[in-house]
Amino acid sequence: MTCRVGLTEWRLAPSGAAAIRLAAAVGADGIQLDFGGPGRGVLVDGPGRAGQLRAVADEAGVDLLALAGNLLNDIGLTSQPAVVQPVLARLADTATELGVPLLIVPSFRRSAITDAMSFTRTAAALRWAVSLAEARGIVLASENVLPPARARQLVEEVGSPAFRLLLDTFNPVRYGLDPAWLATELRPWWADQIHLKDGPPDTGPSPLLGAGQGGVRRTLTALRGSPAPVRALVLENDYRDGHGARLRADLEWARRAAVNARESEKGKLT
């Protein structure tokens, strides 16, 4: 099966329909959309908006790969259920309306997992949310920077075949973890889409893929032979400065990596 190359809406200068059209213009196969919210753009669950975005994507020939609930980093996934559950329900409903296969729930800033209490609350929130996702035929993925033992515990406590972990090729580095090590240790539980970046820095003009300190090549090599093949390599370097040359260079790098992923998968089948 083809390994696609995609973009993340929240790391581009334009948003919404314009971001989808940009993805088509630069030759990306797909795009992950952000749900929006204060300081994050127009909410995708506004009247008619999801349908409009889906129509634009169909017309442009761009796959809608995932929906990310980045506003949870502002609200806090560890907030009381009365606060977080309505947001998770809106995310699941919107993901269904968009027709995406993956819903991303991040655990950074106010959603960071920093102690036993935040871990317990995160597991409870994800367990509640994954029941909604599973009923809709959607995979729910947690993006976090837990070490392997705690990440495995999270998978066990959520306890659903519709739950996965989302691998980022640089975020763990900022927390003293090696993404290639994580890729190997947590191999059975990764979602089939991966965020590619190779900082530092995490924001602003970041190193081109393969030229930074993240060791993105080692991480992708470590994923070879995973039970679940990688279906999408998604760029998450910061392109909000509108520097098209960097975006195109990273797309070309990712395209070569996607070809390698396909060849690796063929090797498993022969």
Swiss-Prot record:
UniProt keywords, alphabetically: Isomerase
Signal peptide per UniProt: none
Active site location: 143, 236
The EC number(s) this enzyme carries: 5.1.3.35
Superkingdom per UniProt: Bacteria
Molecular function in Gene Ontology: isomerase activity
UniProt xrefs under Pfam families: AP_endonuc_2 (PF01261)
Catalysis performed (reactions): 2-epi-5-epi-valiolone 7-phosphate = 5-epi-valiolone 7-phosphate
UniProt family annotation: Belongs to the hyi family.
Biological role: Involved in the biosynthesis of the alpha-glucosidase inhibitor acarbose. Catalyzes the 2-epimerisation of 2-epi-5-epivaliolone 7-phosphate to yield 5-epi-valiolone 7-phosphate.
Identification of the protein by name: 2-epi-5-epi-valiolone 7-phosphate 2-epimerase
